[in-house]
């Protein structure tokens, strides 16, 4: 359906348009309302579903904007929030009256339509077909034009246009698109009425946050007076018992509101909108067809109400998010949060019930929202009560965002803005908790204070140290965990788990930026349409298995059932085995998703290959028998070589090369599992114990080799090549191998001594295996830092410094640190000691590097800066970032540009088709303007 696709697009722009009056949301909802008879309430529900996630992410984006914006902006938000929270209930009810009448497809009034931001496009093709049929039956040109809808549609300044990049506008916070939140934030103290009217397009919503009321406007399809379905956010006027047929009841009153009157004469108006059915037989006949279609779709019960309540939840979440970020900057938020908590309490009953229904609908977003919203609503109440300690809200943000769209983006945006904007969140939170820089630590502290928070606080309390350290590592070191509580989740969540093909605005930022000050170079997180699913990397697919793009979540919360639930389990129970996952997330391979290496990788990230792989590469001309021949066989050859030197030639023992078979009396046991080895001289069939080796000619086929294996097992004489100088060559090779082996032993001993001198005591105690020598760099770092944790903070900086300076090189003990951390996850106290010390030190160092030394890092688009594709490629080449991340991010960047241009062109063409012109939203013009 065009509607569904457009709803998805609008869902995208919801994030943008939460800041921008939710212009697209209003468009979608208005369109869907416009086509109520066509049974597209499901599309409304779909757009609401998208809007739910988008509202959360959009508000989180706004929070990030608030964090990025001046404190004055946040103060404005707080002022707005104070007014909004006091008026939320009334505003919701008022919003229910904002869309008083709905215009049906036949052109008759179904009530008043909201004056602005209402692009009545829904199912434009079907709609225009119906209108054309109806218009062809009318002689009066004005009536025909009215029915055709050419004077029904008017675009206000919704930030849509042929060349208008909503994402960039959202990033820049300077465009008219951002008038809604940013202008409100900037201008609400001066122009609450104007901005709110422009943003909300409702005289009723002067006091509301534009996000909240715009979301309400999107949901308010409601007309209690006109007996239409009440989609009121705050009201109880609708329910699962509302029959859809009620919409189409002919007895429904059709008041003609003066605000939407056309300029038709009274006579013409009475003819066109007469309630006399005798003059409307053509319309009624056409209407019945669509009513039949609509009734077939709806079966008399609206489950859409559930989705709509999710939007209410998201509005509450949006309130809390805005208040959280505002709390970070302002004390006024206590009142706001209390008011919001009251709203959350009002909506909790509705939203919880509806969220369960959404879970039944099989939408993973809603299921996640169930966890998030239920926990968050309860958490919101606690958090709102404790909003002075903003960290609870932040922890909720972590959980919520993680649950919501893999909005790791949101988590890391919130957490990263909290961590990066140590000025705002962390400093303020550090004012509350002077011990740690990280929000998650603060969250854990707050969680310790607030054990009543359902999932976030209790689970964070269960994992206090795990989440502290992991979130510290995830937030500041961005351990690209999709599943841990933070992980840049912002953009790192590169999994497209939903059907939509669109990724976030700057997926590039995702893993690299998630924690580090790199976020500051990205500008606000507004550029990330988090509602959009994220495509999985190949490693992720291998790690989790190829999952269907869309699936309904299982009924249980098995942490292994899906990434969602895995993620839920991290936040909900014991981090869903989140101890090891978070540790893996932080250290082993940068995320439960296997961003660095699969969990079963024998080498943890950064650990260098064992020496035999380096010194005895199979590509060397010398046959690499050390890997394949048993040690005692090597010792035997050494012993024989010594005898050769000591004894006279006549008494010299025969030397058996590895290619030859020693006398049958020398190898008691028969070989067990022969294997074939390729060498420059040919193939070798060797047994596990290395006692019996056979050389085949170089041109021997594999089939003949298999027969040789059988021959060896049957004690048949081995095939020995007749090489004249072969034994001499083998002797030289064995001498070389002996020398290499001795050198290796010496090097290992020296390096182990150095390591023992340099390794801190707590690491020596925790070592569970001998250190693997590193041949690429003999010096061990004085103050080891886990490259895995540094990687995301300053990948470009650390990847360069780790080679040149010993201070930032990876300690071989890092794998041992991983073990310690897993143990520490089980033992939270140990985690605090090791992880808080190490990770906080690392975080401080990383922060110092980011803030003070300002390492060279790729430039991401700032507030007023665009980054073209070539420049993006060049920046990535210079920053020595991971190639797979770059490729993924580049592909997503291209897809974003295509999607943005498609949306803009689509709307622009739609405007052209309807003979529309873009005008200033400040003009209070009638929607029905025949002069269009």
From Swiss-Prot:
Q: Where is this region: Disordered?
A: 26-120, 158-289, 304-617, 635-720, 802-863
Q: Where is the composition biased (Basic and acidic residues)?
A: 606-617, 854-863
Q: Where is the composition biased (Acidic residues)?
A: 265-285
Renumbered to this chain, the Polar residues biased-composition regions fall at 242-253, 476-492, 527-540
Please note every region of biased composition (Low complexity): 41-105, 163-241, 304-475, 548-590, 635-666, 696-707, 813-853
- What is the protein named? Putative uncharacterized protein DDB_G0289263
Task: Record the organism.
Answer: Dictyostelium discoideum (Social amoeba)
